[in-house]
Each structure stands twice: as structure tokens, then as C-alpha cells.
From Swiss-Prot:
Keyword check for Hydrolase: yes
EC number: 3.5.1.47
Domain of life, per lineage: Bacteria
Reactions catalysed: N-acetyl-(2S,6S)-2,6-diaminopimelate + H2O = (2S,6S)-2,6-diaminopimelate + acetate
Record protein name field: N-acetyldiaminopimelate deacetylase
Source organism per UniProt: Geobacillus thermodenitrificans (strain NG80-2)
Length: 377
């Protein structure tokens, strides 16, 4: 029989019940049940929508250190074949938030039993994948009352081996924006295309034109990505489609590039309206702020990891990944780092299986870091 640590077991429990943004009711209850099993003398627990705040009072606090873990899953049908695979059809923890939660609970458990001088604030945040839980959580009355002096978060990285962390000072993750474009023309019989305005053709033309933006409208020394991940159009093979919907994402390493990309998208869409005699509506959906690591705190963290732990530390490059933790970092000094979990499949893949050995390594590492930071003069 397989022997696993308590927090690996927790991860497997949570992996079975992935839930989408602001629908994490089972997840919230599971977390609350566990938190309520801990010594309560120094804990103050409050809920916010489907999220949770847990404050651990220090022995003689001079500051509050925040730690954020996201809790939502993705609308992906799992293909791992694991015995603890998702029990929710069409939903999966394909971005490692089950790992994030189990690590947070492990660290919380230690400090519930072994308080340090400073206060700790654990933030279990819903809806990271969308529509975005960090910004409204940051603006909540609870956060205003308990606002930490610094804040930390991690994200699993399938490409790095267990025992590795990766981060950098300054910009770590990109600015991101959702992109939805609806095209409305005139449907008709497939035999009479001259009497209709075909939105399949219009959509295909627009997708091709959008890909020219990065090549011809963004500074080559800057970076941008435009991806159309989904196109919906038509009802049957012999009817010309009256409507088409494009769904995608924009990612840039600067606000200026994001604004330039959006201006060009709007110009191209106007051109498609004229060329294909259709109506178009653009919706940018949710936009996530860049993740910008506080240079001083990040340098200090890297030096701690290199000199006080056995973790392998990599100073990585910035990534085009999007993370709404950026909103918290825009108001609170802190940083985010990658945690190696050594999986052949990447984030958002239906076969993602993080190496669970990373969980206890991360718990021990963060306990060491917070103990050091939380007792520092």
C-alpha cells in the first residue's frame, strides 16, 4: 500500500473536486473543515465569497506577511487516468491550484502550532483563472483591515525539476487581456453565397490579419502574443453562417504594447466590417496586471534560498504567463516564484501530473523562509 504524507493526501482530495471561479463551494468547505481542525488560539478565520482569509497572530508582531494560494480549477476534461482524478465532468485542476492549496495548508499547519513573532495572513483566493478574484479580494473590507506589509505566492512549473525554484527581480509575468470578437453578417443558403455575408470567411480573414500585428505593429524589442484559441460559427454544412465569435488572449510585457495591440485590433476589425459588410463587437473581458516582483524583497529571498536551504535557485526570464496576483503586487510589496514539479505535460494540459514530492519540499522551504523573515528585526 502506498504511503503518502498528509498534505499529498490533501492534494489528492482537492484534485477530485475542481471548481470554476467563484463556484468553489466544495473546495471552500474542505479548506474550512481542515482549518477548523487546527489549534484556534492564534487563528482568526473569515470568508469572502468562496475565498478564505486566515490570520495567524504572532507573539510580538511588527509586520504582517501575506501568503496567497489560488483555489479554482479549469474547464478541462481530465485525461490522467489517476485513481484520484477529477470527479467533476469537464473540470480539472490543470494549473496546479490543488498543489498550491496543499502547500498553503502545510505551512499554515506549522505556524498554527509554532507561531513566530510577526503576524501571517493566508489568503485562499478564488477565480484566478477567471473572471479574476485577486482584484476584488484586494478591495474587500477584510483585506483593508488585514492588509499585509508584504505578500508572497508561488506557481508550479512543470518544466523545472523538484527541488528547484525560479524567479527574478522586476517583471516576471505579462500583462494579459481576454479578447472576444463577435461578427454578424447575413446568413443564407450555401448555393447562393452572393445573397449572404459569410461570417466564416470574415472570421478566417480576421484571424489571419490579427497575426500580422505582432510581426508588423509591435516594437521588435518588445514582446507580444495574440492567440485565438476558439472560433464558433455556423449550424450546418449547407447554410452560410450569419454569426461568428472569436475568443482569444493578448499578452504583452508592457502597457504601451498592450495599448498598441488593442488599437490595431480595433482598426483591423473596422476594416473587416467594411470589407465583409458586417457588424462587429469587441469585448476585452478580464485584464490581468503584470506580475512585478519587488526587487529588494526578491533579491533577499533569492539570497536566503541560496544560503539557507538546499533548493536549486534559477534566475529565470520573464514569461508571457498571466496571473491576477499582479494586482496584489501592484499595491503590496512582494514577489512570486516558480516551483519545479517535473511533469512532461505543461500547465492547462489534460494530462498534467505534478510530481507530488514537490509538496513537502515546498512546505519545508516556506516554513524556513517565513520563520526567518517573520523573526527578523
Amino acid at each position: 500500500m502506498e504511503t503518502i504524507s498528509p498534505f499529498v493526501a490533501i492534494r489528492r482530495d482537492l484534485h477530485k473536486i475542481p471548481e470554476l471561479g467563484f463556484q468553489e463551494f466544495k473546495t471552500q468547505q474542505y479548506l474550512l473543515n481542515y482549518i477548523q481542525s487546527l489549534p484556534q488560539e492564534r487563528l482568526d478565520v473569515r470568508t469572502w465569497k468562496t475565498g478564505i482569509f486566515v490570520k495567524v497572530s504572532g507573539t510580538a508582531p511588527r509586520k504582517t506577511i501575506g501568503y496567497r494560494a489560488d483555489i479554482d480549477g479549469l474547464p478541462i476534461s481530465e485525461e490522467t487516468g489517476l485513481p484520484y482524478r477529477s470527479e467533476h465532468a469537464g473540470q480539472m485542476h490543470a494549473c496546479g491550484h490543488d498543489v498550491h492549496m496543499s502547500i498553503a495548508l502545510g505551512v499554515l499547519t506549522h505556524f498554527a502550532h509554532n507561531p513566530i513573532r510577526d503576524d501571517l495572513l493566508f489568503i485562499f483566493q478564488p477565480a484566478e483563472e477567471g473572471p479574476g478574484g485577486a482584484k476584488p479580494m484586494l478591495e474587500s473590507d477584510i483585506m483593508r483591515e488585514w492588509k499585509p506589509d508584504m505578500i508572497v505566492a508561488l506557481h508550479i512549473a512543470p518544466e523545472y525539476p523538484v527541488g528547484t525554484i525560479a524567479t527574478k527581480e522586476g517583471l516576471l509575468f505579462a500583462n494579459t487581456s481576454e479578447l472576444f470578437i463577435d461578427l454578424k453578417g447575413k446568413g443564407g443558403h450555401a448555393a447562393f453565397p452572393h445573397l449572404a455575408n459569410d461570417m466564416v470567411v470574415a472570421a478566417c480573414a480576421l484571424v489571419t490579419q490579427l497575426q500580422s500585428i505582432v510581426a508588423r505593429n509591435v516594437d521588435p524589442l518588445d514582446s507580444a502574443v495574440i492567440t485565438i484559441g476558439k472560433i464558433t460559427s455556423g449550424t450546418v454544412q449547407n447554410v452560410i453562417a450569419e454569426h461568428a465569435r472569436l475568443e482569444g488572449t493578448i499578452r504583452t510585457l508592457s502597457i504601451d504594447a498592450m495599448q498598441a495591440v488593442k488599437r490595431r485590433i480595433e482598426a483591423l476589425v473596422r476594416g473587416v466590417e467594411v470589407a465583409y459588410e458586417c457588424e462587429a463587437v469587441i469585448d476585452y473581458g478580464a485584464m490581468y496586471h503584470e506580475v512585478y516582483n519587488n526587487p529588494a524583497l526578491t533579491t533577499e529571498f533569492i539570497q536566503f534560498a541560496e544560503t539557507h536551504t538546499d533548493m536549486n535557485v534559477i534566475r529565470c526570464k520573464e514569461a508571457m504567463t498571466g496571473e491576477d496576483f499582479g494586482y496584489m503586487l501592484a499595491e503590496i510589496p512582494g514577489f512570486m516564484f516558480w516551483l519545479g514539479v517535473d511533469s512532461p505535460y505543461g500547465l492547462h494540459h489534460a494530462k498534467l501530473v505534478p510530481n507530488e514530492a514537490a509538496i513537502d519540499r515546498a512546505i519545508a522551504f516556506l516554513i524556513s523562509y517565513f520563520s526567518w523573515k517573520g523573526n527578523m528585526e
